[in-house]
A protein has these predicted regions:
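Hydrophobic secondary-structure segments that place a key small or acidic residue at a functional site
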Residues: 93, 130-203
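Structural motif
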Residues: 62, 84-90, 151, 214, ...
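Hydrophobic, regular-secondary-structure patches
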Residues: 35-109, 116-119, 125-137, 146
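Mechanotransmission and gating elements of multispan inner-membrane complexes involved in transport
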Residues: 165-167, 174-264
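N-terminal Sec/SRP start-transfer signal
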Residues: 1-34
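Extracytoplasmic
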Residues: 57-59, 103-108, 119, 136-138, ...
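Alpha-helical membrane-interface segments at transmembrane helix boundaries
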Residues: 13, 29, 44, 48, ...
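Soluble periplasmic/extracytoplasmic beta-strand elements of cell-envelope proteins
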Residues: 61-65, 90, 107-112, 142, ...
């Protein structure tokens, strides 16, 4: 018998003495500590899994960006759809706007989605807590639960939307009317950063707001095997011509995922 086992047993069960209270406390203390550790680890693993799932669902598996506005995005999207790893592709544009309902202004992130191809890549319909995906058109908006609560709006409410371009022109004493959008849906993704301050409009609406013309900021991809997103993104990134580059959802949230690993 190893010497440390021998001394441990001698301390727990001294020769010639009955089972001691201290031995019982020691054994139960270790058992309780291990049990608590297992429970905490199980809860954390479930928590991390839910967050990772929310991140993947709201970001898409892989995104293709451009260091400049993407003009020929239709050709790029068609080429990507030819790859066997890719199941669906949709364009996107994004920015920051000021929205106002009555006297209350808010500055949420705005996402522009193509209603035809967006739902093939992102499960927008499953995020909706009010409204229907068919209600999203060029004169309507979906708002996150955080935006709805902070502005006190619901289905049918009207929002005045201003972009930085509009605000800049207003400084030049130009009279510009805001874009009036009707709230057609309220969504919740489970990812606080999105749910706290995000609105969703059609791609055409965002292109109009930001003066993009037919250009977009990038493409979002859904893969046949989402688990291969990091590997596929690296491979695609090496093959794409400049100024295009690819990032997986894990790359885009690398810092946050690192913090989650530390928490575990």
């Amino acid at each position: 018998m190893k010497w440390y086992f021998y001394w441990a047993l001698r301390q727990l069960f001294p020769a010639g003495r009955p089972f001691s209270f201290f031995a019982l406390v020691s054994i139960l203390g270790v058992a309780l500590g291990v049990m608590v550790l297992l429970i905490v680890q199980s809860v954390m693993n479930g928590f991390v899994h839910d967050i990772r799932d929310s991140l993947a669902r709201t970001n898409g598996d892989v995104r293709v960006f451009s260091s400049a506005l993407l003009d020929d995005w239709r050709e790029v999207a068609a080429d990507l759809r030819e790859r066997e790893e890719v199941e669906a592709v949709t364009p996107f544009a994004q920015g920051i706007v000021m929205v106002q309902e009555g006297p209350r202004p808010l500055f949420p992130q705005v996402w522009g989605m193509d209603p035809a191809t967006g739902p093939e890549v992102l499960p927008v319909d499953s995020f909706l807590v009010a409204g229907s995906l068919e209600d999203l058109d060029d004169r309507s908006v979906f708002v996150s639960t955080g935006v709805a609560n902070r502005l006190g709006v619901g289905i049918g409410s009207d929002l005045d939307v201003y972009t930085p371009l509009m605000l800049e022109r207003m400084k030049e004493e130009e009279v510009l009317l805001p874009l009036d959008l009707r709230v057609a849906g309220i969504f919740e993704t489970g990812w606080n950063e999105v749910d706290r301050s995000t609105i969703l409009v059609t791609l055409r609406t965002l292109q109009e707001l930001y003066g993009l013309g037919d250009r977009v900021h990038g493409l979002t991809l859904r893969l046949a095997d989402p688990e291969k997103a990091p590997v596929f993104a690296r491979t695609l990134d090496a093959e794409l011509p400049e100024p295009l580059f690819a990032r997986s959802w894990m790359d885009l949230n690398e810092d946050f995922l690192f913090v989650l690993r530390l928490e575990k």
